[in-house]
């Protein structure tokens, strides 16, 4: 278990990854490179041990990879196969990394489909939060709410690039790291009732 991974160490690991994967076209166009990158980020930057990671890859037919983190499942990640870039709207809120989901879904079909699909998976699996990514951009949001707001009308934590994630790493760490999920910080950031979190995992 990588529970002892510190914020400083995790940020340093992401900096190394950004330096090593500076060829964006390679990340976008080579599926195995992209999946290896996501694997590294999950383990080295967010402290998830291999024993807490379940991966199902549907590369031929559906064009995405599902990661389930935690036992029971706390995070579901949909990693798109296609070498696409998510078009992102300008941030309208004070926090530049928080964007409302309806605006995200208006920007392009691929992102809308990814958001809708991972939200459905997350709700069915009882995940605390879900992530849609193409390997270099990350959209993080809550698949369910108990405050009366439909989940797809809420807000998402958005990192427009790996460099943007590095610049705002504390925010990413609190949202989807192993220790961040244990402390339920994503709910504070995205404004959901804390009772919607799944049972504590080992």
Roles of regions detected by a PLM:
Residues 1-129, 137-202:
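A short, conserved, highly charged catalytic patch centered on acidic carboxylates
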